Amino acid sequence: MGKVLSKIFGNKEMRILMLGLDAAGKTTILYKLKLGQSVTTIPTVGFNVETVTYKNVKFNVWDVGGQDKIRPLWRHYYTGTQGLIFVVDCADRDRIDEARQELHRIINDREMRDAIILIFANKQDLPDAMKPHEIQEKLGLTRIRDRNWYVQPSCATTGDGLYEGLTWLTSNYKS
């Protein structure tokens, strides 16, 4: 009955996996979307999962820790993922190559072949933050031709760009 009602009223559900290097801002983004406020976070060991409703879409967001020791566990969360949010700290130029390697490792996994990709180019408020076109180039996104991707500039602490990212996900997701 729930599926019938959601077809009539347009409520969709989407499973989102939010990944990125440690300290990119994943947990801050999750709770800014969920609670509408900036929260103090500690490094995520394991995961946080929250449902965020926006424009008649229920996003089930899985925020998984990004420390290098736990990245091998990311693949256990891939199954059923419809959208990948990959968060990049745009002020961390020293680790942008590491971010690119991790992103391509994720999207080349067959479990993730149907997921659309939203990149949050986060921490845009910091001096010398890389702009979206630079992130696009440094992450090698132009080589991804077999699926939809988008780079959204964002600032997790103020919320800038976050809802624009969700809007992109809703308009590009085919249920």
Swiss-Prot record:
Annotated binding of GTP, by residue: 23-28, 41-44, 63-67, 122-125, 155-156
Compartments where located: Cytoplasm, Cytosol; Cell membrane; Endosome membrane; Recycling endosome membrane
Residues with lipid group (N-myristoyl glycine): 2
Transmembrane annotation, as ranges: none
GO biological process, one term: positive regulation of mitotic cytokinetic process
Membrane topology (UniProt): Lipid-anchor
Major enzyme class: hydrolase
SUPFAM superfamilies in the record: P-loop containing nucleoside triphosphate hydrolases
Principal cellular location given in the protein's record: cytoplasm
EC number(s) reported in the record: 3.6.5.2
Catalyzed chemical reaction(s): GTP + H2O = GDP + phosphate + H(+)
Keywords: Cell membrane, Cell projection, Cytoplasm, Differentiation, Endosome, GTP-binding, Hydrolase, Lipoprotein, Membrane, Myristate, Neurogenesis, Nucleotide-binding, Protein transport, Transport
Gene Ontology molecular functions: G protein activity; GDP binding; GTP binding; signaling adaptor activity; thioesterase binding
UniProt xrefs under Gene3D superfamilies: P-loop containing nucleotide triphosphate hydrolases (3.40.50.300)
GO cellular component: cell cortex; cleavage furrow; cytoplasm; cytosol; endocytic vesicle; endosome; filopodium membrane; Flemming body
Function: GTP-binding protein involved in protein trafficking; regulates endocytic recycling and cytoskeleton remodeling. May modulate vesicle budding and uncoating within the Golgi apparatus. May contribute to the regulation of dendritic branching, filopodia extension and dendritic spine development.
PANTHER family assigned: ADP RIBOSYLATION FACTOR-RELATED
Protein family according to the UniProt entry: Belongs to the small GTPase superfamily. Arf family.
Name of protein: ADP-ribosylation factor 6
Organism for this UniProt entry: Gallus gallus (Chicken)
Record gene name: ARF6
